[in-house]
UniProtKB/Swiss-Prot annotation:
Function recorded in the entry: Formation of pseudouridine at positions 38, 39 and 40 in the anticodon stem and loop of transfer RNAs.
Binding residue positions for substrate: 124
Record NCBIfam families: hisT_truA (TIGR00071)
Catalytic reaction(s) noted: uridine(38/39/40) in tRNA = pseudouridine(38/39/40) in tRNA
Keywords, ordered alphabetically: Isomerase, tRNA processing
Enzyme Commission code(s) on record: 5.4.99.12
Protein name: tRNA pseudouridine synthase A
Enzyme class at the top of the EC tree: isomerase
Subunit structure: Homodimer.
Annotated organism of origin: Corynebacterium diphtheriae (strain ATCC 700971 / NCTC 13129 / Biotype gravis)
Statement: the UniProt record of this protein carries the keyword NADP: no
InterPro entries registered for this protein in UniProt: PsdUridine_synth_cat_dom_sf (IPR020103), PsdUridine_synth_TruA (IPR001406), PsdUridine_synth_TruA_a/b_dom (IPR020097), PsdUridine_synth_TruA_C (IPR020095), TruA/RsuA/RluB/E/F_N (IPR020094)
Phylogenetic classification of the source organism: Bacteria, Bacillati, Actinomycetota, Actinomycetes, Mycobacteriales
Alphabetical GO biological process terms: tRNA pseudouridine synthesis
């Protein structure tokens, strides 16, 4: 219990195509994922609901493994139609929410759980095709098109140079007061072509956290290396930059999906949240 409330975790998915991103835009009527879910929860529970999310996805970005949490007076869950059961609440919400958002699980979690700060790492997948005709019609909403052919080996070499804890300022849009030091744990390129979907690639990207537009910038940097526009060593050189680099294209939002978020065991939730809230400095970077 937190000041007489209980904490509930949501596991959810959405097609980001028709949303202006995750975050509610103040009092604006812009359609965002947060606004849709908060407004629906508020309607059903008859309490104001504020969501905290693991990853604030941009406009057009999708999620299959997004995580959020909210706190609520347990009395709000005791109506006849819910009876204290989160599964019943999911069913109530499903009847009211649009088809491009789905909550697939709800559960009570400890007060120490924080969807954002307790997360150990976030996993993203980026789908892109270089086929002249673009993506299959059935995958056009979650697959980006790159207009030139690429060398996947060159892209993987560019990705490998970025693994580890670095200052990714060159890959991040500026946000006042935000650190750009991140621990990039996985960045692998895969040729997932099929006869129906030739020239199709996926980038699997994992880090403890990502700054604003970082994943799409990482992908864009590799794509320009893969097409031969930038030379070997391009991405490694960018790690020395101290501000956003204009030489990096930001890959299209439609190809990106947040596919998972990892959390520690319950007894480690508070410690992880405290660690994640600490502002990282260059003193923490490994010696070269």
């Amino acid at each position: 219990m937190i000041n007489g409330t209980v904490r509930i975790r949501l596991d959810l998915a959405y097609d980001g195509t028709d949303f202006h991103g995750w975050a509610r835009q103040g009092d604006s009527d812009l359609r965002t994922v947060q606004k849709i879910i908060e407004d629906t929860l508020t309607l059903v529970l008859q309490r104001p609901i504020d969501l905290t999310v693991a990853g604030r996805t941009d406009a057009g970005v999708h999620a299959t493994g997004q995580v959020a949490h909210f706190d609520v007076d347990p009395a709000a869950l005791e109506t006849r139609s819910i009876a204290g059961d989160p599964a019943r609440l999911i069913r109530r919400l499903a009847r009211l929410m649009p088809d491009d958002v789905r909550i697939h699980n709800m559960s009570f979690v400890p007060a120490e759980f924080d969807a954002r700060f307790s997360a150990l790492r976030r996993h993203y997948v980026y789908r892109v095709t270089t086929h002249p005709r673009g993506a299959l019609p059935t995958r056009a909403r979650d697959t980006a098109h790159w207009p030139r052919s690429v060398d996947i080996s060159a892209m993987q070499a560019a990705a490998d140079a970025l693994i580890g804890m670095h200052d990714f300022a060159a890959f991040c849009k500026y946000r006042e007061g935000a650190s750009t030091i991140r621990d990039l744990q996985e960045f692998t390129w895969h040729d997932v072509s099929t006869p129906q979907e030739p020239q199709l690639y996926e980038a699997h990207v994992t880090a403890d956290a990502f700054c604003w537009s970082m994943v799409r910038s990482l992908v864009g940097a590799c794509l320009v290396v893969g097409e031969g526009k930038r030379a070997d060593g391009f991405t490694e050189h960018l790690l020395g930059e101290t501000k956003r680099s204009s030489s990096i294209p930001v890959a299209a939002a439609c190809g990106l999906s947040l596919v998972g978020v990892d959390y520690p065991s319950d007894d480690q939730l508070g410690a992880r949240a405290e660690q994640a809230r600490a502002y990282r400095t260059h003193d923490e970077l490994p010696s070269l």
